[in-house]
Design a protein with these regions (language model features):
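ATP-dependent carboxylate-amine ligase
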Residues: 1-117
Length: 117
């Protein structure tokens, strides 16, 4: 299961390519927001989807990155691997010049705790 998006204010020509590769290479692709910066997150996702065809595989759009991570964890089955791509060490989501706290490690740990209870 791959969770990925494309950053805003970066080369928009790469977005369809990333969509194609992301959906082709994952059993399940979850397309989400990744530092939209000054761009509209929905417009970035629309650019990503220009490279995606239904025959490439299953994908779902979940614009909110926290919700996308939780969705991936909710649908994962035994022996599935979830790849959270793009953020790496970053602990924020940059939206319109503001860096909002978003640490994917914290999100995963919190949702794992919820799933256990």
């Amino acid at each position: 299961i791959a969770v990925f998006g494309c950053g805003g204010d970066r080369d928009p020509m790469k977005r369809p390519i990333m969509g194609e590769i992301g959906v082709k290479c994952a059993d399940i692709a979850i397309i989400t927001s990744d530092n939209p910066r000054t761009e509209d997150p929905d417009a970035i996702i629309e650019d990503i989807l220009k490279g995606v065809k239904p025959e490439y595989g299953y994908y779902k759009v979940v614009c909110d990155r926290r919700a996308a991570i939780r969705y991936a964890m909710d649908i994962a089955e035994k022996d599935d691997i979830i790849v959270l791509a793009g953020k790496g060490h970053e602990t924020y989501q940059e939206i319109n010049g503001v860096k909002y706290h978003l640490d994917e490690r914290e999100e995963v740990a919190a949702h794992l705790e919820e799933l256990r209870n």
